């Protein structure tokens, strides 16, 4: 069996690690995996792909510099020919597609191919995310009537996504699956020792430092807690250069609220084990309807409760005041109240952390179920 894994992004984040974990499972179980990655992939991504057969493609994504619109158009035309010729020559049994954008701009090559198309969906359909009525109106018709029909197997990473896909026009052909993310196995390369001014409960955030992830709201919640005399620290792991203007805004909040002794930015880290061991509670304060985050299952595996907002797909696997805190109100005040709960009830940290770990098995989030489900997707024809 030959599987082409589409990897059209250029750098390593949660979604990319999650897809590479699937490649690893398939390869370990006798499937031949060829990864079609971007010609603009970073050295870090290329290094992660060392153990796979690879093929570079000119994907119309993450292009930078002048004349970007022309570059996108050029690559869109290129990829139609590149992918069509490659699929015709190699005839893979399956193609694993990780994003709706890739599914859309590769529709023509897929349409003329006999390969089984597996779409791993971890985001809201674009028909929900785009605000332009003209775009949404036209695209929703193409999506429902044409693009979705070429998907043979839909793999959703949350019930939330399954429902959204059904609402957008998906009709299950009998092979669609719900597979929650298993935290990708990371290479725990030792970083410098995490330096933290530990003062009370240590909250942690790990991920992309961008507005939708709620880091600003997290710092504002920290400010409220400090004014109220609470003792706590916050450890933030992630690359601040992803959105420099946003990072500058965060630094200003820290300075203006005298949080220098409470907040620690440690940058992008490899040694995630040390990060989780240093933290007591993990904060995942996404302010948009995030379908799922790898960090939820990852925090469970390290016996850590997490704080989330009651939206998107994450409440499916976090039980309020049992394995974490589910905050109904998406607000700074709601977040600060949840954090204050752990500060005032430190015994709950260990208790809920243990329940979080046990819930991995109860919710079938363990690795054996993850492997079995993915192998059932890629069956011999």
Residue ranges and their predicted role:
Residues 149-175, 183:
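A short, active-site helix/loop in glycosyltransferases that binds the activated sugar's phosphate group
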Residues 75-79, 116, 125-150, 163, ...:
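Nucleotide-sugar donor phosphate/pyrophosphate-binding loop at the beta->alpha transition
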Residues 43-48, 161, 166-167, 235-260, ...:
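Short, structured helix-loop element that forms part of the nucleotide-activated donor/catalytic region
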Residues 5-13, 25-70, 176-178, 242, ...:
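N-terminal strand-loop element at the rim of the active site
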Residues 4, 195-213, 219-222, 235:
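Conserved donor-binding/catalytic core segment of Leloir-type glycosyltransferases
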Residues 79, 97-103, 121:
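Short His-centered aromatic/hydrophobic patch
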Residues 320-321, 325-332, 341-346:
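Conserved acidic donor-binding segment of nucleotide-sugar-dependent glycosyltransferases
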Residues 305-308, 318:
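Short hydrophobic beta-strand element within catalytic cores of glycosyltransferases
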């Amino acid at each position: 069996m030959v599987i082409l894994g589409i990897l059209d992004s250029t750098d390593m984040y949660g979604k990319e690690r999650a897809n590479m974990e699937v490649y690893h499972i398939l390869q370990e179980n006798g499937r031949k995996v060829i990864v079609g990655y971007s010609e603009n992939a970073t050295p870090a991504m290329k290094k992660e792909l060392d153990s796979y057969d690879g093929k570079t493609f000119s994907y119309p994504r993450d292009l930078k510099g002048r004349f970007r619109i022309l570059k996108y158009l050029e690559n869109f035309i290129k990829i139609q020919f590149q992918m069509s010729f490659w699929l015709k020559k190699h005839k893979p049994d399956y193609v694993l597609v990780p994003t709706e954008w890739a599914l859309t701009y590769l529709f023509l090559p897929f349409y003329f191919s006999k390969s089984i198309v597996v779409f791993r969906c971890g985001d809201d359909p674009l028909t929900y995310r785009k605000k332009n009525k003209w775009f949404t109106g036209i695209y929703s018709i193409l999506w429902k009537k044409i693009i979705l029909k070429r998907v043979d197997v839909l793999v959703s990473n949350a019930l939330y996504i399954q429902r959204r896909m059904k609402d957008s026009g998906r009709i299950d052909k009998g092979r669609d699956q719900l597979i929650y993310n298993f935290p990708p196995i990371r290479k725990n390369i030792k970083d410098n020792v995490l330096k933290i001014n530990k003062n009370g409960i240590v909250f942690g955030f790990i991920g992309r430092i961008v507005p939708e992830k709620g880091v600003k709201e997290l710092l504002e919640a920290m400010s409220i807690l400090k004014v109220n005399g609470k003792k706590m620290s916050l450890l933030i792991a992630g690359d601040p250069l992803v959105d420099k203007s946003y990072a500058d805004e965060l630094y200003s909040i820290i300075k203006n609220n005298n949080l220098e002794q409470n907040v620690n930015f440690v940058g992008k880290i490899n040694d995630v084990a040390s990060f989780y061991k240093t933290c007591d509670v993990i904060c995942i304060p996404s302010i948009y309807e995030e379908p799922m985050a790898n960090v939820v299952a990852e925090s469970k595996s390290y016996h850590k409760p997490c704080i989330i907002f009651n939206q998107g797909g994450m409440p499916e696997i976090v039980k309020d005041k049992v394995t974490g805190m589910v905050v109904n109100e998406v607000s700074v005040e709601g977040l600060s109240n949840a954090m204050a709960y752990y500060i005032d009830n430190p015994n709950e940290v260990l208790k809920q952390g243990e329940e979080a770990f046990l819930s991995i098995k109860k919710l079938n989030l363990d690795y054996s179920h993850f492997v079995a489900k993915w192998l059932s997707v890629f069956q011999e024809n």
